[in-house]
UniProtKB/Swiss-Prot annotation:
PROSITE patterns: GNAT (PS51186). This is Mycothiol acetyltransferase. Coiled coil: none annotated. Acetyl-CoA 1 binds at residues 80-82. InterPro entries: Acyl_CoA_acyltransferase (IPR016181), GNAT_dom (IPR000182), MshD_Acetyltransferase (IPR050276), Mycothiol_AcTrfase (IPR017813). Keywords: Acyltransferase, Repeat, Transferase. Catalyzes the transfer of acetyl from acetyl-CoA to desacetylmycothiol (Cys-GlcN-Ins) to form mycothiol. SUPFAM superfamilies: Acyl-CoA N-acyltransferases (Nat). Monomer. The gene is mshD.
Length: 330
């Protein structure tokens, strides 16, 4: 087997092949193997020095792919996918080894989405260990019948969001305005996620790329703005036209990201904006909403459970064996 090709840039042909194999894996496994961020990097390219693309090739065609994002002072963060028709040939292991060899000074971590048997098997056989979990939670926005996927399940009540009087005097809730709110939102996002490298370091280019995606809807992007024009908190919702594995193709919603500026923590804005977004998705006629939350964020899990969400699935981040640890012979 050839060593995977490693590059800082993908030409259009390879990018299309990666998108095709990722869709084939999603259809076979029932879970998307690559995050939205990775797919945007494949489609639009990445800033110089920020990313690495690893490709397993057969007859010049991409049959396996790994993406690695580099953030200074943090371990590289990656994802790996192999086309369903080309599994069992060592491509997954070869890509993991390639990512590990190419890692930056702080090492590398790799996500496995949905705990698919193939991903878990490859990681364990090669000595990688789980170091982080990202829970997926779901909630119905209408009553789900017993003969529907996920049913039966009665939708919870979603009360109108209310702000405490002392908070309501200082902020107002409104939708995001394209061309006006980008910089204020980026500043608030960086403060809210200062300890979260994947989310907290989003750039203007990252935001603008999302604004031209088919799913983007500023009316579903809720801000709490202070009198000085700054963003105190926000809730960005998203609609998945393909059902995101929750339906047989009927669109569903997502709590895409909720953030609160540290100065506004404890104000109740997070809950109020979450409710505003959920009611927006419900009123759009969507049957389900889902979200992602870090496994160690117990406060957020409790908040979402209090609103009616329940655990659905888990993504797992793996770390490679220590340098002095023997690798299994696979």
């Amino acid at each position: 087997m050839d060593t995977p090709l490693v590059t800082d840039d993908l030409d259009r042909t390879l990018a299309e092949q990666v998108l095709t194999l990722a869709e084939a894996a999603r259809a076979a496994d029932g879970v998307a193997p690559l995050s939205e961020h990775t797919l945007l990097r494949v489609r639009h390219g990445a800033p110089s020095g920020s990313s690495r693309f690893h490709l397993a090739l057969e007859d010049g065609r991409a049959v396996g792919f790994a993406f690695v994002e580099r953030v200074a002072g943090e371990p590289d963060s990656g994802e790996v996918v192999v086309h369903p028709d080309h599994r069992g040939r060592g491509h997954g292991t070869a890509l993991l080894h390639s990512v590990d060899r190419d890692a930056g000074p702080d090492g590398v971590r790799v996500w496995a989405h949905g705990r698919t048997p193939q991903a878990v098997s490859v990681a364990r056989e090669d000595g990688w260990t789980a170091v982080r979990e990202l829970h997926k939670m779901r909630m119905p926005l209408r009553d789900i019948a017993g003969d529907e996927p996920g049913g039966p399940w009665e939708a919870p009540e979603l009360p109108e969001p209310e702000l405490r009087p002392e908070v309501a005097e200082r902020v107002r809730l409104r939708p995001f305005v394209v061309g006006q709110d980008e910089q204020a939102w980026l500043a608030a996002n960086a403060r809210a996620f200062a300890d979260h490298p994947e989310q907290g370091q989003l750039t203007l280019d990252d935001l603008l790329q999302r604004e031209v995606e088919d799913w983007f809807d500023p009316d579903g992007f809720f801000l709490a703005t202070a009198k000085d024009g700054g963003v105190a908190a926000f809730h960005w919702t998203k609609t998945h036209a393909d059902g995101a594995g929750l339906t047989d193709g009927e669109p569903v919603g997502e709590v895409y990201v909720v953030g609160v500026d540290p100065e506004w923590q404890g104000s109740g804005l997070g809950r109020a904006l979450t409710l505003a977004g959920l009611r927006h998705l419900r009123d759009a006629g969507l049957p389900w909403v889902h979200l992602y939350v870090d496994g160690d964020n117990e406060a957020a899990v409790r908040l979402y459970e209090s609103l009616g969400f329940a655990m659905w699935d888990t993504d797992v981040m793996y770390a490679p064996p220590r340098d002095d640890a023997p690798r299994p012979n696979v």
